[in-house]
Amino acid sequence: MLQDIMNTKKIKLHDCHFGSPLCDPSPAPHLLSSAAAAGLSFHPGLVSSAAQHQQHGAGGWLHEEYYAPRSSPPSSLLAQTCVGSNATAFYAAENLPQFDFPALGTAAAAAAKAPFRSSESELYRPVDPLLLRADHSVRTYYVRPQKRDSGERTPLPPPSQQQHQDRIHGLFAGAPTTRLLSGEPKIHSFPPQVAAKPILPAMDAPSLQNQMENQLTRNCIGAATPVTPTGNLAGSGAPSKTRIRWTQDLHERFVDCVNQLGGADKATPKGILKLMNSDGLTIYHIKSHLQKYRIAKYMPASSEGKQLEKRATGNDMQNLDPKTGMQITEALRVQLDVQRRLHEQLEIQRNLQLRIEEQGKRLQKMFEDQLKASRSVMEPQELDDVVAFAAGDGDDDAFDDVDVQLLAVAGSGYDDAGFQSKIS
């Protein structure tokens, strides 16, 4: 009875995680009886994982490790983990490789043997393969299936060496015109330097492709337009200009040719070029120099004179010998010394002038102070004279009053004696 319950849990867990067509979601009695009759022993990790899945729900990662005895071979271990009639059907249903490699195999070798998933299984992640350890133990990981995003693409398998050679073969083979007109070349022909190498580096392929495409473009233009040595097409434009130096002799020859052709107004660049017949001169040089010659000829006399003076001064400076240059330098140094001394004398004179003005202000102030002092001395004497004169006038008035009083007394005495006084 306990074995039947374990088998039922094993079938349910296996169908929930991997959707195997070998297991029926509804535990039928005949399947349980057939499994029990076959005497299949189930992986204990699956039973414990199923219990953990029922305990925590569908939101956890299931992880169980089972270490088999060292005596049991890997084939027996793999047979115990299978559900079905044989191991081949289980591997085909779960898209797992046949674990027939040595015990010390790597994950890369197992992944290389694994078949590529179809579009029907894109909703689930592939189950990690069972890796055999050195001690003949099996480690099994059960991962919860997750739905992929709609925009996520299925990873492509790594390209093999044959595919890489075919791609390089299609990239460099055939003539350029055949590749341009008819698409993919039919005949594979490599240059000698390319044929020497079995596999070309991937980094060199774009540059070689660009070179071949450029050569194809040049060939498609046609043989009627030859390519010039400068790299430009003959009909696309003028070649690059070269600069020359117009020496005095060359300029004199140019002026003679211009005069022979009737002057700067009537002379043409082609006629001047034919008359000069000088190597290295082109029509562009003649045109440029003729334009400058015309501008210099019709310029005003003043500007022309200034240019002549500048040229003469420059020529004189160039023709000076070192001794004359030293003399001129010494004269300039003496002139600077004289100017410096003159400037110092002017500063001294300015300081003296300021001192003289300040001394004049002081003298003016002293004169004003002396005048004020003299006025203050003369004013008290005048006041004394005025006071003395005023005192003399007061004494005369007093004597007159006394006389008047005496006469009044005398008059009153005569009145008392019986005489009428006529004094008023």
From Swiss-Prot:
Gene Ontology CC terms, in alphabetical order: nucleus
Cysteine disulfide partners in this protein: none
Coiled-coil segments: 326-391
Sorted UniProt keywords: Activator, Brassinosteroid biosynthesis, Brassinosteroid signaling pathway, Coiled coil, DNA-binding, Lipid biosynthesis, Lipid metabolism, Nucleus, Steroid biosynthesis, Transcription, Transcription regulation
Molecular function in Gene Ontology: DNA-binding transcription factor activity; protein homodimerization activity; sequence-specific DNA binding
Known tissue expression: Mostly expressed in roots and leaves blades and, to a lower extent, in leaves sheaths, culms and panicles. Localized in leaves lamina joints.
Name of one Pfam family that matches: Myb_CC_LHEQLE
Name of the protein in question: Myb family transcription factor RLI1
DNA-binding region: 269-294
Compartments (UniProt record): Nucleus
InterPro entries: Homeodomain-like_sf, Myb_CC_LHEQLE, Myb_dom, Myb_dom_plants, PHR1-like, SANT/Myb
Motif (LHEQLE): 342-347
Induction text: Highly expressed in the adaxial and abaxial cells of lamina joint under Pi-sufficient conditions. Strongly induced by nitrate via PHR2-mediated transcription activation.
Record-stated family: Belongs to the MYB-CC family.
Main location: nucleus
Source species of the chain: Oryza sativa subsp. japonica
Function text: Transcription factor binding to specific DNA sequences of target genes promoters, such as the motif R1BS 5'-NAKATNCN-3' and the motif P1BS 5'-GNATATNC-3' to trigger their expression. Nitrate-induced component involved in modulating phosphate (Pi) response and homeostasis together with PHR2; activates directly the expression of Pi starvation-induced (PSI) genes upon nitrate disponibility, thus triggering the nitrate-induced phosphate response (NIPR) promoting Pi uptake activity.
Gene Ontology terms describing biological process: brassinosteroid biosynthetic process; brassinosteroid mediated signaling pathway; cellular response to phosphate starvation; negative regulation of unidimensional cell growth; positive regulation of DNA-templated transcription; regulation of leaf development; regulation of phosphate transport; response to nitrate
Annotated knockout phenotype: Compact plants with reduced leaf inclination associated with shorter lamina joint length due to smaller adaxial and abaxial sclerenchyma cells. Repressed nitrate induction of phosphate (Pi) starvation-induced (PSI) genes leading to an impaired Pi uptake activity. Lower accumulation of ILI4/BU1 and BC1 in lamina joint cells. Reduced levels of brassinolide (BL) content. Strongly reduced biomass associated with leaf senescence symptoms and lower Pi concentration under Pi starvation in plants lacking both RLI1 and PHR2.
HTH myb-type domain sequence ranges: 238-298
Region span, Disordered: 144-165
Binding partners and assembly: Interacts with SPX1 and SPX2 in the nucleus; these interactions prevent binding to the promoters of target genes, thus regulating negatively leaf inclination in response to phosphate (Pi) starvation.
Gene: RLI1
